From Swiss-Prot:
Name of this protein: Uncharacterized protein YqgA
Keyword Cell cycle among UniProt keywords: no
Pfam family, one: DUF554
Topology in membrane: Multi-pass membrane protein
Cellular localisation: Cell membrane
Keywords per UniProt: Cell membrane, Membrane, Transmembrane, Transmembrane helix
Organism listed in the record: Escherichia coli (strain K12)
GO cellular component, one term: plasma membrane
Transmembrane portions of the chain: 2-22, 34-54, 56-76, 102-122, 147-167, 178-198, 210-230
Length: 235
């Protein structure tokens, strides 16, 4: 039985609850500065993943086509609508952030928690090897990340633990079918595309550039097939 997804989801859940409880006691300067630090950390992780790229054209094409599909399907608009409805469930919060700021930050952390290369690879790795160490290490970071964001976004951060658990359990259980079909170069290109998404997420959290990160998610589905095709036809 896999345990990593449950540990990771619990870390987000507890971090979100603790952050919401401490929101009135944690100084604003710490919350603001730490949010920027987490954005910077996301940028750093993204860079480390991007440099692993094995086939640059495949990575670029997957990102471009994935973003195009996301734009056509209006993925981020759909998420924004769902998040706006979720926000209405927490109107009793004493310190409710502005609607636009809430939407932007909430969408960013959904991607940060649920679509990070570390989480996806960690879940797949545990599904194949039974080793939960990657997800356990990620849980420490996610606990403090959730706590900091919950100070400004409230208990809604804890809700992210539900899709996080579902995604990671699905990946872990499907890993036995997926990983035998992959090659090291496919995994490298998949990680590189995830790194680009983390770079976009980091820039978004820092407020530098509001990339439509959710619209870029289909790129993750295209990364491995395009990498395999590029290797077969051009490498």
């Amino acid at each position: 039985m896999v345990i990593g997804p449950f540990i990771n989801a619990s870390a987000v859940l507890l971090g979100g609850v603790l952050g919401a409880l401490l929101s009135q006691r944690l100084p604003e300067r710490i919350r603001v500065s730490m949010t920027s630090i987490f954005g910077l950390a996301s940028l750093g992780i993204g860079i480390l993943l991007v440099v692993k790229c094995a086939n640059l054209p495949a990575m670029v094409l997957a990102t471009l086509l994935g973003a195009l599909i996301g734009e056509i399907c209006l993925l981020e608009k759909g998420v924004n609508t769902a998040v706006a409805k979720a926000q209405n469930l927490f109107r009793h919060s004493r310190k409710k952030p502005a609607h636009e700021s809430f939407i932007q930050n909430y969408v960013a952390i959904i991607v940060l928690f649920c679509a990070s290369g570390t989480g996806i690879f960690g879940a797949m790795n545990e599904g194949m090897t039974g080793d939960p160490s990657i997800l356990i290490a990620k849980s420490f970071l996610d606990f403090f990340t959730a706590m900091i964001f919950a100070c400004s976004l409230g208990i809604a951060v804890s809700v992210i633990s539900i899709p996080l658990l579902i995604i990671q359990l699905t990946l872990a259980w499907a890993a036995a079918l997926i990983l035998p079909l992959t090659t090291p170069s496919m995994m490298a290109d998949f990680s590189a595309v995830g790194g680009l998404l983390l770079l976009a997420t980091g820039l978004r959290i820092c407020g530098i550039k509001m990339f439509p990160v959710v619209n870029m998610l289909p790129a993750l589905l295209l990364a491995m097939p395009l990498s395999a095709a590029w290797t077969a036809w051009f490498a």
